[in-house]
């Protein structure tokens, strides 16, 4: 009996002495595991963020049908960018892409960008150079995007130089045609009379939708136009070939097109920030800065909120995917399981130069992650 009591005392003594040591070790081990888990999660998110940025660059070029980023310098952009009302309004009203995903709707966009507005600058034409033995303005080449979309508006914008006294200006837009037997090379498109006051020059728009539609139906008839804006003394006030101090005052065409709207569906998901300890699949903030890429060819936005998905898709949380859970139970080693991916994405509007130095305002689908989920 005394031997049994002695064994019990020894056992209790060992529990008292050794117990706290074991608890401290377990606590330290648990803390180390938690720190290691958080560190791994941060590293994983950083890698995911970097991959997302590279993927965005590739997607933008692909969706805009560009093999490489247009090589346009800042100086060239200052010269090409029209100082005209429609473009200034787009830029002035532009803001960083808003993170507005509260409606929970998902657009089933086509892969390629949906163009809304195309601003086309004039280019040189051999035919124009031959008329009267001197250069004429203007010849416009049209993007294939205009060919395959419905044109709802087409405006020719011209800039008139300032006058010193109140002046009546006669504006005439002529369409070039193949020389006729009587030598005629022009046919009238529009004529209008303007009263100009002294001061700064003005921008004037002229509706050319019908002419554009005819050009699209018969591309061979597009030989260019000539612009005249004569004052009472016969001086031409239209800026067709900008001189010193007239950068950004070239004539240009503003063409608006529309596409069929897409249907929508609903979805939900978790939102986290960079300091979150959430391990499950979650949406994290990510701002893409185009200036950091050196992409000066993107006029607006200069940056936008793209967001990205990161986190685990543990099978214990997968009541939403019973078929995947059953597959995992049947073959746990052979099933990779669902991944944390975007389940809701929305487009961004973008104003940019394409490879032909045309200014395009369009909608690029699926560029903002609004919701993340396991799929």
Swiss-Prot record:
Q: Where in the cell is it found?
A: Secreted
Q: Which domain of life is it from?
A: Eukaryota
Q: Which Gene3D superfamilies match?
A: 2.60.120.970, Cystine-knot cytokines (2.10.90.10)
User: InterPro entries under this entry?
Assistant: Cystine-knot_cytokine, TGF-b_C, TGF-b_propeptide, TGF-beta-rel, TGFb_CS
> Glycans attached where?
71
Q: How is it modified after translation?
A: Synthesized as large precursor molecule that undergoes proteolytic cleavage to generate an N-terminal propeptide and a disulfide linked C-terminal dimer, which is the biologically active molecule. The circulating form consists of a latent complex of the C-terminal dimer and other proteins, including its propeptide, which maintain the C-terminal dimer in a latent, inactive state. Ligand activation requires additional cleavage of the prodomain by a tolloid-like metalloproteinase.
Give me any GO biological process, just one: positive regulation of macrophage chemotaxis
Q: Name one GO cellular component term.
A: extracellular space
According to its UniProt entry, the function of this protein is described as: Acts specifically as a negative regulator of skeletal muscle growth.
Protein family (similarity comment): Belongs to the TGF-beta family.
Name of this protein: Growth/differentiation factor 8
What organism is this sequence from? Macaca mulatta (Rhesus macaque)
